[in-house]
Amino acid sequence: MRKETMDGNTAAALASYYFTEVAAIYPITPSSPMAEAVDKWAATGRKNLFGQPVKLVEMQSEAGAAGTLHGSLQGGALTSTYTSSQGLLLMIPNLYKIAGELLPGVLHVSARSLASNALSIFGDHQDVMSVRQTGVVLLSSGSVQECMDLGCISHLAAVHSRMPFIHFFDGFRTSHEIQKIDVLEEEDIRELFDWDAVEQFRTRALNPEHPVLRGTTQNPDIFFQIRESVNPFYEGLPDTVQLYMDKINEITGRNYRLFNYYGAPDADTVFIAMGSSCEVIKESIDYLNTRGEKLGLVQVHLFRPFSTDHFLQAVPASAKRIVVLDRTKEPGAAGEPLYLDVRNAWFGRKGAPVIIGGRYGLASKDFRPEDVMAVLDNVRRKEPKNGFTVGITDDVTGLSLPAAEKIPDTAPADCVNCKFWGFGSDGTVSANKSAVKIIGSHTDQYVQAYFAYDSKKSGGLTVSHLRFSKTPIRSSYLINHADYIACHNQAYVDSFHLLEGIREDGIFLLNCIWTDEELAEKLPEELIETCLLYTSPSPRDRTRSRMPSSA
């Protein structure tokens, strides 16, 4: 293995490239960079495990890409695709066929919200939850490192089990977050690949030399029985996924499980979640457990098929309160999907804990340690609110939890936090991407970069969030405590609270064309007061005159 700095999309694309012979693509935000990366590698002659460049097929829509995925798999080629949101919805008819015919295709999905009352390009789990009934295996990653590792596991297990996989991770929050990770090399995974299963897959392919009949119409006399005959494949699937998790664990030294437990062994309150929120919850648990709490987290990796036995084994027997967090909304349902699975796991069992559920993070709404605290405060009430929302103020139906008090920075103590305010297309985001990759590649620092911006291609507000630390960074939320803040557009001084959250010894850099005299007049009083508060006590005029005018 080698260390490399990349985002979640690149990690998933690299994992898929090893095992893919044909890639059927159609671009859609935020999954497009995966197809772009595969296209670039194939064009430069990069080889997969079979010693050939990937054959890329770009179709007219996601429906065409799904049809190509289906047909290519029927023809005996290991095929992948990359999509999200409405694109995944267009693939549903083919997913039923692919799963029903036991074809080992893999879809890598940067999970994104669906267009309902409005369209949003940002991340949640609405699209993935819309395909859970198709029979496709759903495997969740919560970080850039997991995108690499579980991306490989999805392909390894798909071929071995003859089952199609959707490997999904949070759009933007994970797909576009840059981290330094361990990259699995070809020699690391070649020996793990089930080459016999590949040969059997090719033998079952449609071939005029040994014709078979598929895709028939069946009548009531046999359809039910044949549909039920697929059950053994799903019953054995969890063990297959864990088998390859164990093999990846041996190579990497990590500990992947179908349901990973993190926290106090005798926890009385346990969170259940999947995706990038798990990193936030882990960081919050570390902070709170050192202060006397007994908290834990069960991170769901294998969501479908949901293995109740493996899930219950992961939850400590000491748990008295369970909080299930879903990053989706299913209007009219008795509860959100993960919540219902967890409730069902304890149905009819004696001594079941109190189980409540809620929603968070729709359309990439930031999920912070303060939100974890709000959820914790709620579950400890005498009558906790069920079906709650967190991170927003719901003044219509009153489902939102009251905001918790802000807690100190839960990131590593040595973590340096930097924010850059920029203007879409001014180069701030691109420069920061280059800088963080250089620092990650040429120093021993762990790095994290996330870029907050709206749907406009250019001309909008951008805020770059960069973190640097000697230890791995799990802070999958926007920076609230900054050591360094730079503003690259002087107009922002009147439009935004630029210095909100700056540390006492923080640095503020303003890129502007004003002279020292103009600076004293142009800067808003609030910004000046903040600068005075965090500098040595001196006359205001003197402070103004010392402030830099450009960068």
Regions found by a protein language model. Give the residues of each.
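Conformationally flexible catalytic loops at phosphate/diphosphate-handling active centers
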Residues: 50-54, 165-260
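Conserved thiamine diphosphate
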Residues: 121-171, 348-363, 533
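Short acidic, glycine/serine/threonine-rich loops at helix termini
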Residues: 34-39, 68-70, 91-95, 116-122, ...
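Thiamine diphosphate
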Residues: 1-130, 135, 152, 369, ...
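Phosphate/diphosphate-binding loops
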Residues: 326-348, 352-388, 478-492, 498
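Conserved small/polar residues in nucleotide/adenosyl-binding loops
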Residues: 534-543
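Anionic-ligand anchoring segments at beta-strand to alpha-helix junctions in alpha/beta enzyme folds, i.e.
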Residues: 22-58, 272-298, 417-481, 485
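ADP-ribose/adenylate-binding Rossmann-like module
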Residues: 501-523
